[in-house]
């Protein structure tokens, strides 16, 4: 009789230990649902120094960023985010930020905003799980202050964007309304593992499949879509995955995703650099500031050089 009792006690201890480990890890998990705090409304704290009515941009690039990513923002300002004309079309770049509890970081961003005039900010905690709020803030800004933009791109701070090739493809596409493109995700499912960065509970999203959406690393849409998404977003249940949330809005609007080109141009997984390859892509992920500067310089230095036909 002693052996079964000891075995039962051993099993109970194992179960108890597993439960203790689970809850201790959950309390330390930075991606649990309780880790994000958001406000659905609020005034803009910072607005960029630009007037779209006087000089309507062809392409507005909205870059999600955080207070600690100054090096990333500076590298972007010196490369693909520099305000300039491409094929006679004006491009403008703006950075999307929330707020931080650090007084020093707040002051630094205030000074940066005064110097560059390219920061859009609202009063919500700047954490990963508020990326939907950050993205919708940018879309709201286009809706309210820059509806004249022909196209909008939402992207991230660790991206290489070939704005020259993107502009060329958009001009060839000749689409001005209800257009949305990027790295298409057409058959994605919610991740239910609590320790995943992309965990979504049944209470947050009860369905078993996501609608078609584009990877949040970089997607492009015609200017009219900004106002349509902003208006319909008020009736769409909030989900912390911003690319999925935008996909839900597009589903409500019956806007279908389209390929930008017959060949792949968006690379959310990263790529090995070569001048000829990067001339024919639109977006590449996992690019550090120093690397971005090096890639950009290599592309600038090779202007006029021929590449083998694809």
Swiss-Prot record:
Residues 1-7 are cytoplasmic. It holds the Pfam family Galactosyl_T. Residues 29-310 are lumenal. Its main location: Golgi. One of its GO terms (cellular component) is Golgi apparatus. Glycans are attached at residues 130, 174, 231. The chain crosses the membrane at residues 8-28. It is a single-pass type II membrane protein. One of its GO terms (molecular function) is N-acetyl-beta-D-glucosaminide beta-(1,3)-galactosyltransferase activity. Expressed in stomach, jejunum, colon, pancreas, small intestine, testis and gastrointestinal and pancreatic cancer cell lines. Hardly detected in lung, liver, adrenal gland and peripheral blood leukocytes. The keyword Transmembrane helix applies. It catalyses: a globoside Gb4Cer (d18:1(4E)) + UDP-alpha-D-galactose = a globoside GalGb4Cer (d18:1(4E)) + UDP + H(+). This is Beta-1,3-galactosyltransferase 5. It comes from Homo sapiens (Human). The lineage of its organism: Eukaryota, Metazoa, Chordata, Craniata, Vertebrata.
């Amino acid at each position: 009789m002693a052996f079964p009792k000891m075995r039962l006690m051993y099993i109970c201890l194992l179960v108890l230990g597993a439960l203790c480990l689970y809850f201790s890890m959950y309390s330390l998990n930075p991606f649990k649902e309780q880790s994000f705090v958001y406000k659905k409304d609020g005034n803009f704290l910072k607005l960029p120094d630009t007037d779209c009515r006087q000089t309507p941009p062809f392409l507005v690039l909205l870059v999600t960023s955080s207070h600690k990513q100054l090096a990333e923002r500076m590298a972007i300002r010196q490369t693909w985010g520099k305000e300039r004309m491409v094929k006679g079309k004006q491009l403008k770049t703006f950075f999307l930020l929330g707020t931080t509890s650090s007084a020093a970081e707040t002051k630094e961003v205030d000074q940066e905003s005064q110097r560059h005039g390219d920061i859009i900010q609202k009063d919500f905690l700047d954490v990963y799980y508020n990326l939907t709020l950050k993205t919708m803030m940018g879309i709201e800004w286009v809706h309210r202050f820059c509806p004249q933009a022909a196209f909008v791109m939402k992207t991230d701070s660790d991206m290489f964007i070939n704005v020259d090739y993107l502009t060329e493809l958009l001009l060839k596409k000749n689409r001005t309304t209800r257009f949305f493109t990027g790295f298409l995700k057409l058959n994605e499912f919610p991740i239910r593992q609590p320790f995943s960065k992309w965990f979504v509970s049944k209470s947050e999203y009860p369905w078993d499949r996501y609608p078609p959406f584009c990877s949040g690393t970089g997607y492009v849409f015609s200017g009219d879509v900004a106002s349509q998404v902003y208006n319909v977003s008020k009736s769409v249940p909030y989900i912390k995955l911003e690319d999925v949330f935008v996909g839900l809005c597009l589903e409500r609007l019956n806007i279908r995703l389209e390929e930008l080109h017959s060949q792949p141009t968006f690379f959310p997984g990263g790529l090995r650099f070569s001048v000829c390859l990067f001339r024919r892509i639109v977006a590449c992920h996992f690019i550090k500031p120093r690397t971005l500067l090096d890639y950009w310089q290599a592309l600038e230095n090779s202007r006029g050089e021929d590449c083998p036909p694809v």
